[in-house]
Amino acid sequence: MTPEQIVRKFFEEVRSGNNPDYSNQLMAEKVLAHQIVSEEEQTVCRTPKDYAEHVREMIEVYGNFSLEIQEFLVQGSKVYVRWKQVGTHLRETDGYQPTGLPIVQMASAVYRIEDGKISEYWIQIDRSGIQNQFDFNKNLNNI
């Protein structure tokens, strides 16, 4: 598969929550995950199993969320994806009790493919936007 096909399949099967365990077909044994939180970069090492569990945790918190790819660019072994994820706040997260209201997440990542698998990625998530929604929904439920 080409880098484009690998990342598209990753989003269709794994990141979407449709088949998290398919991560073992598309991800290297150890993947460097560079995560931008505010202006601070954190790098963690993820395995396909870890990533599948991460997706299952998202499903527990946000239900069967929708995921829409808004931009998809390929340059050699790197693939850039920007997406919108919409779920329902069903479980406590980040100190916020569930509201049953929608939560929209905007995010983007660059995936690097090596030997036919995702071996590294750099991800940015609009955490401030998510925080604002949690605060707004909390106040809305307190009215």
Spans of features found by a protein language model:
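C-terminal and inter-domain tail/linker signature
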Residues: 1-143
